[in-house]
Amino acid sequence: MSTALDGIRVLDLTDRSGALAGRVLADLGAEVILVEPPGGGSIRRLRPQLRRERESERSCAHQYLNANKKSVVLDLADDQDRERFLAMVATADLVIDTERPDRLDELGLGTDDLLAVNERLIRISITPYGQHGEWRHRKGVDLTAGASGGLIWVSGEPKGTPVQGGADPSYVMGSLAAASAALVALTARDEQGGSGVHIDVSLQEATVMTVMQTATPTLLTWQGRIPRRPGLSAVVRCADDGYVGLLIRPDRFERFLAWCDAVGVDHGMTAADWEWSLLNAPRQGNPVSAATLALASVLTRDEFAAGALEADLVCLPVLGFDDLADHEQYVVNEQFLTVRHDPLGRELGFVRSPVDAMADGVVISRAPMLGEHQHLVSRPVSRPVSGSVSGSAQAPGSAGSVMTTTPDPAPTAPTRSATHPGQALAGLRIVDLGWVLAAPIGTRLLASFGAEVIRVESSRKPDSMRNQLGPDGTPDPDLGGLFNTVNAGKKSFAVDLSTDEGLALVTELIAGADAVVNNFRPGALDRMGLGYKTLRSIKEDIVLLNMPGAHRKGPWAVRSSMGNILMAASGFNMLTGFPDERPRGIGIPYPDFTSPHLLVATVLAALRHRKRTGEGQELHLSQLSGVVSLLGVEWMAYQSGGDLPGRRANRDLNQCPHGVYPAQGSQDGDYPGHDGPGDEWVTVAVSSDEEWEALASLMGRPELGTDDRFRTLDARKTNEDELDRLIAAWTADQDKWACAERCQLVGVAAAPVENLWDTYHRDPQLRHHYQIVHQPHAPDVDIPIDREIAQWIGFDHRLNRSPMLGEHNEYVVRELLGRSEADYIDLIVNDVLG
């Protein structure tokens, strides 16, 4: 059992939208206490459900997301229970909640009230749209976060209805952002000596971050282009009706042609046609696509995957849940397990923890029965003027609320000496060997919060992110919009690791570092001479994080991988989209955005462990395993009932109607790349019978609210096809923004499906999301980048630009490594640097 967060107490006030945050902290060793209302939290009643169990214990979401936690029951509307809660706050480190903005203030439990009891308390709030802005009181669910965050727009078939990702990806991203923020804030408080802080996590902004590659803002600001579906999702149907996920890179193009020749596919290409394999190559008339389809027409799924492996292409099979348990890759790595639930008298199916990278492992214990740990409730105590006892953050509570016209209060400066977020990790040095997205985004998070992150790279084998287009349409190593977003705030040390001198420099640099991060294939670091045994001989307490695409072992361990291909092999794609369409998944490389927060959480947890024990450790954080672990609710339902979960398109088991409906376009008129009418959409999600009655009245059809076909959730689900037709007919002639606002005014969650133009120019809630940075050699070029998801209330957290290639060579060699100017010049002359 991981003990990294031993001694940390978390009060968890979350619903489904934030429950994963507390689960991650519990898996890392924190004591996480669910504070539930009488009758239990709403997550206990969600579908899918275990069969033949009492109502409060049957929800798979509760059993999976609340594993390793404890449960107490308190009515926070009751005076005595509020005092009992405050007494618990006095001994807590974190409170995580999903309550609507101002809800806890109305109960006398706002941030100031909590800090008055415990000035070292960290509060993290996860809400649909954050604590500030015009939309802060709007209701929101995963569907609306995906719509307003730009993810749904890039997901689905090019001419089809946009699709929501399976297994609630916006809830996942918000929860993971909260968990990583908790580790950052704990580090700041305990290492910098600061007091508590209130951290704001918006599900919408967490979602916007996931489209940073598919919908990089500079595509719009420099190229006048709006990315369209299907984004970065590519799957191919094979001869046996199975599917594979495939990416053909330019450096493997000739091997692809050789494979086509061996199979007998006539492709008509030569090595000179490699540009057709670029990600941004035209889709129409692409001979690479034609050759791929020809291969798939004569090969089964497994034959295709085996041939691609032989050609060293990035390819994995698209797997469903019925494939996973017995697949060698997952069996070898013990991906799935069962947990005994004695009170229920049964075994429950689980997936390995998302943070199982910890060297001391993660043991999973069953979720608590309602009120099982009531003995932990403290007696009411008089409130101190200020507290010095370490406290814990609670998990989010209710994600939705009826929109009101309450004015948005201006953020107030903290009254206590909380650490500035930009200095939260000051004093930590990270050597970043990361490549492309997954690891570099994680180290960007560390850099944004004050760690010194030194990116080790080389002009001789540059990261593909260094080849992004600049404002003039040609590749530029320093100006690329995505590169600047992914590497904001870092330093760059350009060195040739293939030379003895270069390797010696990096080895010496690591000797003064706290952690080393990489996302190479297993064994690559050892072959470079930088394996864990070597690093321990350099610095005994070093923390090394390896983040391979698949696992350390198994047939896929040595394969090249990309996020969207891993997504396809995880089971995710078979939970997403319409049953009659290709299982594309969503239009982003999903693991590239879940993994960074897990990287931050595990690295900081390992450093916390080192602080207490003096021990470093090697962490193995599989991107594939991490994504599979995020499908645990669906996996548990499948294991308990045997029913294969299907692709439910935009429908939901707990909300109905719940979908993406046709609408009209922006009232501001056309925009670059807009195809005109026919591709504008609005999302609507009804969570209760009362909300359905309100929506029916808004539609001018109040009789539908009490119609037996639609009066209850079960009735609406039975008649969902007819219901969707009614909703679509109502939304079709409305502007998507106005329609969503009308729904919100009557208490129904709704949001426009936003494209890049909408998120960058139109959405008032995202007005401050994009920050502008400049490079010294191009001061007039505005480069928009995404700000951090976790906003520390009361602070202006501005990010720095990314480094120019080799910008900090002299700093590293002379200041950090203590070499002379003459030595530095020799390294340049001998081509060791650069």
Locate the predicted segments by residue:
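Substrate-binding/catalytic subdomain of NAD(P)-dependent oxidoreductase enzymes
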Residues: A185-R225, S233, F304, P317, ...
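A short glycine-threonine-serine/GTX helix/turn-capping micro-motif
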Residues: P162-M173, G196, P227-S233, Y243-G245, ...
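Mid-domain beta-loop-alpha active-site segment that forms a flexible
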Residues: T144, G166-L183, L203-V211, G231, ...
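N-terminal helix-loop segment corresponding to the beta1-alpha1 unit
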Residues: M1-Q192, T218-W222, A291, D302, ...
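Conserved PLP cofactor-binding pocket of PLP-dependent enzymes
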Residues: G307-Y330, Q744-L766
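Aromatic-enriched alpha-helical interface/lid elements that frame and gate functional surfaces
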Residues: L232-A311, C315, A399, P657-V746, ...
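Terminal low-complexity tails and localization/encapsulation signals of metabolic enzymes
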Residues: M1-R9, V235-R237, F321-R429, R651-C656, ...
